[in-house]
């Protein structure tokens, strides 16, 4: 189960850092081929350089789907390269109904064998049900995302005067989490909102993107959510260098993100 593997990796590596494996062909180091094979080489080098620093890896489905069947194979090879004791969280943001949702769930959990997935709640419970029924898998549901456009919908006020994203958090915590396999996606760019969500629903793990390139502050996130925060960093680590020493550079950046966490636990 994702959370068990996450807790074990977080303890052994003294880290709640999740590295997003979002390989952009245009940004691969110059010596690597700009194709699916290059992506696999790139990802494997990043994984080898950072596997003792992370609590999870999060491949983003879109970067692999864009390459067709070769990209799908690259995704499977990437997942196979991740040490078995480190959980894999698929960033897919799925959200559909009926047999379509069932097919998405089967693709993620059976074909790819990932431990967790991100989901969109916009279509309601039945669009999430095929995922939530898999009690051995964890579902991170979009709640307060780090992109500025999230305000267009997530910050709409309901009749009780509270924003929609808090209703999403309530639904997840009180109605959709019967298998205790739910978490929320909350952006690091909104630490006050993270604190509110964590105070109301402290049992929910929080996947927190937006640290690094998007401007989120890791110390503010840890102050708001503590041990429940899974800090995702992608571009800042992946593209720390465009040269042949890119993996070593990625490791140094990843290590820098560990300092606040270690300071928090070991004053």
Curated annotation (Swiss-Prot):
It catalyses: orotidine 5'-phosphate + H(+) = UMP + CO2. The keyword Lyase applies. Pathway: Pyrimidine metabolism; UMP biosynthesis via de novo pathway; UMP from orotate: step 2/2. Coiled coil: none annotated. The keyword Coiled coil does not apply. CDD domains: OMP_decarboxylase_like. The active site is at 93 (proton donor). This is Orotidine 5'-phosphate decarboxylase. It comes from Herpetosiphon aurantiacus (strain ATCC 23779 / DSM 785 / 114-95). The lineage of its organism: Bacteria, Bacillati, Chloroflexota, Chloroflexia, Herpetosiphonales.
